C-alpha cells in the first residue's frame, strides 16, 4: 500500500483501533463483575451491579457496527479529519455513557443523546460525499472542497452540549 493511500485512512484506522481497546475495556468490566458475583463461571444474570455493567456493554456493542460504518463512510467519501475527530468524540461520549449507566441511569442520558448527534453528523458527511460523487458523475461539478470546508467547520460544534 502506498503512502498516499495510507495517509488517506490512517486517522480512521487509529480511531478504529482505539475503539477496539475501548470494547476490550468494557468486556473486561463485564467479566470482572461476573467473576465477582459467580466465582469462575460467567453468568448472564446476577446482581444489579452486574446487570448494569452487562446492559451498558450490550448497548455499546449494539451501536458499534453503525458507528464503524458511518465513521469509515464519512472518512472515505467526505473528509478524514472531521470524521476522525467526530469518531474520537463518539468514543469519549460512549465512555461517558458506559460509566454513567453504572451509576444512576439518568447519568447516561447525556452521553446517549450526544452519541446520537455524532452518529447523525457522520451519516450526513457520508451522504454529502455520495451526493458529491454523483454530482461529478452526472454533471461534472465537484463540490468536494466546499463539503470538506463545511464539515471541518461544523465538526467543532459537536463539542457544544
Swiss-Prot record:
- Broad class of the protein's primary localization: nucleus
Q: Outcome of mutating residue 66 to A, per the record?
A: Strongly decreased affinity for the inhibitor MK-591
List localization entries. Answer: Nucleus membrane; Endoplasmic reticulum membrane
Membrane topology per the entry is:
Multi-pass membrane protein
| GO-annotated cellular components | endoplasmic reticulum; endoplasmic reticulum membrane; membrane; nuclear envelope; nuclear membrane
Which keywords describe this protein according to UniProt? Endoplasmic reticulum, Leukotriene biosynthesis, Membrane, Nucleus, Transmembrane, Transmembrane helix
Residue ranges spanning the membrane: these are 9-30, 53-77, 81-102, 116-128
- Implicated in which disease? Ischemic stroke: A stroke is an acute neurologic event leading to death of neural tissue of the brain and resulting in loss of motor, sensory and/or cognitive function. Ischemic strokes, resulting from vascular occlusion, is considered to be a highly complex disease consisting of a group of heterogeneous disorders with multiple genetic and environmental risk factors.
| Name of the protein | Arachidonate 5-lipoxygenase-activating protein
Matches recorded under InterPro entries: 5_LipOase_AP, FLAP/GST2/LTC4S_CS, MAPEG, MAPEG-like_dom_sf, Membr-assoc_MAPEG
Which residue spans belong to the Cytoplasmic compartment? 31-52, 103-107
Nucleus recorded as keyword = yes
The residues on the Lumenal side of the membrane are 1-8, 78-80, 129-161
Endoplasmic reticulum: present as a keyword of the record?
A: yes
